[in-house]
Amino acid sequence: MVLATHTRELLIDTAERLFAERGIHGVSMREIGLAAGQRNNGVTQYHFGDKAGLVVAIFERRSADVNARRLALLGAAQSDGRDGVRDLVETFVVPLAEQVEQGHAYVRFLSRLQTDGHRDLLLSAGSEVTSAYERIGRRLRRQHLNELPRDLFWNRWTLVVNTAISALADYQAGASPLPGGRQLPLEEFTSELVDALTGMLLAATTPEV
């Protein structure tokens, strides 16, 4: 049982990294097993069935920790009286930045799903993945942005979420607009990112012509 659990975790780690690097369709189940050091060609199918099952397993493993961290940040912010737009945006972004800091490929994996058009796989993972997006979004609209039309708000919030994931994935990949390719420290980059995303939500709307 312990060996099976270890093998399963190793396969999830390997798949997360390879999917992030090459995309869902860029790597086979067999390649994942081999990269994880497994000699049984069918080991990945045995544990997860198919790629959709493997993607769900990656989500379940990471999203539990990420969402628990978000809940803790939300609770701490509320207790401290910090419940502004920036504070709420920060509770979404910081747990993702912490995944980057810890060296996990989860954010790059999420970015790959976005850019490769695999929203169906994201939705197949269920409410555990989307609950923080919806919960923080509802609180933002209810407390701060209820003057925005509903569709406009959710469009902006989705842009914020997608931008956060893409920006952190690029950071982890080493991309930088700074001279010499140097990067800001992750903490400073994250703070700047939260500032920019907050500005996206608070931007004035352009009147219809």
Q: Language-model segments: what does each one mean?
A:
Residues 1-6, 208-209:
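N-terminal intrinsically disordered/low-complexity leader segments
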Residues 8-13, 25, 48-75:
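An amphipathic alpha-helix adjacent to DNA-recognition modules
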Residues 18, 25-53, 57:
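Helix-turn-helix
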Residues 71-106:
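Hydrophobic alpha-helical connector segments
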Residues 83, 105, 118-145, 155:
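Amphipathic alpha-helical packing segments from all-alpha helical-bundle domains
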Residues 87, 91, 105-112, 155-163, ...:
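Amphipathic alpha-helical interaction segments
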Residues 91-101, 109-118, 139-142:
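Helix-loop "lid/cap" segments that line or gate small-molecule binding pockets
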Residues 98, 115-123, 153, 157-181, ...:
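Amphipathic C-terminal alpha-helical segment
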